Amino acid sequence: MPWIQLRINTNSDDAETISDLLMEEGAVSITFEDGKDTPIFEPKLGETPLWRDTVVVALFEADTDLTPTIEMLKTLPFLGEHFSHKIEQIEDKDWVREWMDNYHPIQFGKRLWICPSWREVPDPTAVNVILDPGLAFGTGTHPTTALCLEWLDSLDLSNEEVIDFGCGSGILAVAALKLGAKKVTGIDIDYQAIDASKANAERNDVADQLELYLPEDQPADLKADVLVANILAGPLRELAPLIAERVKTGGKLALSGLLKEQAQEISDFYSQWFDMDEAAHKEDWSRLTGTRK
């Protein structure tokens, strides 16, 4: 059965309101697309990431008359009578299959692969992490996650203790354990992140080596040989003294979640405690690494 697709150009402030109205008008699905090629931070679990320029895409059944819907939208003050939109007919597809077909095993560095559960691992002898994409968060597809995974792959983590600060889905924690770490401590402010990390560790048979804490519950004397923090520039600056305290002398640090233009300022700030390396970049994003003084 074909469908009618309505595309509306708007902004992040109004996208959710338009989405709700279109659902009331009978839309069977709503998705958001980037109106321009702009970077977006990884969202927290449960959040919907939106760009400043957002396209709301609604699907309606083929026999739907959209004339009343368009007239209603014209009355909205933030859209107006001549709002930008497009209506077209599209053929039916197996949308679940198409979504699954978009995800393939991805290699990071020399040893590490992140594989959806429905795909066969390309190299059974490699270090394989099984992780299914859900939210656009912590699946390896975001440049900041990729930068951190590549860094972990480059290290000898044998018998090392690791802290994953802002563990999210647990992808970095699980990868570190699969790469040989003796123990990983994951810390996150979100209960959903703690649950997701636990579930992904169980799926990869490393749950007994992973300890998970909310920030207020982390042990006061916690220290590690390696610490990775894939969060954002603001929290990285605010948490710098605590992060430094958590890394043993001579220990390794990786920071990501940074746009290129933010990297130098954060690197300079962390140089109080770490000998900082040159930044690594992927697309618009950066990763900083250093060694504890």
From Swiss-Prot:
Read off the InterPro entries from this record: Ribosomal_L11_MeTrfase_PrmA, Ribosomal_PrmA_MeTrfase, SAM-dependent_MTases_sf
Swiss-Prot/TrEMBL keywords: Cytoplasm, Methyltransferase, S-adenosyl-L-methionine, Transferase
Give the Gene Ontology MF terms in alphabetical order: protein-lysine N-methyltransferase activity
- The enzyme's first-digit EC class, named in words, is transferase
Known EC number: 2.1.1.-
User: What is one GO biological process annotated to this record?
Assistant: methylation
Where does the UniProt annotation locate this protein? Cytoplasm
Where is S-adenosyl-L-methionine annotated to bind?
Answer: T145, G166, D188, N230
Q: Where are the transmembrane segments?
A: none
Pfam families to which the protein is assigned, alphabetical: PrmA (PF06325)
User: Which catalysed reactions does the entry list for this protein?
Assistant: L-lysyl-[protein] + 3 S-adenosyl-L-methionine = N(6),N(6),N(6)-trimethyl-L-lysyl-[protein] + 3 S-adenosyl-L-homocysteine + 3 H(+)
Question: What Gene Ontology terms describe where this protein resides (cellular component)?
Answer: cytosol
Task: State what this protein does.
Answer: Methylates ribosomal protein L11.
The record's annotation in PANTHER family points to: ELECTRON TRANSFER FLAVOPROTEIN BETA SUBUNIT LYSINE METHYLTRANSFERASE
Tell me the protein family, please.
Belongs to the methyltransferase superfamily. PrmA family.
Descriptive protein name:
Ribosomal protein L11 methyltransferase
From the UniProt record, report the name of the gene that encodes this protein: prmA
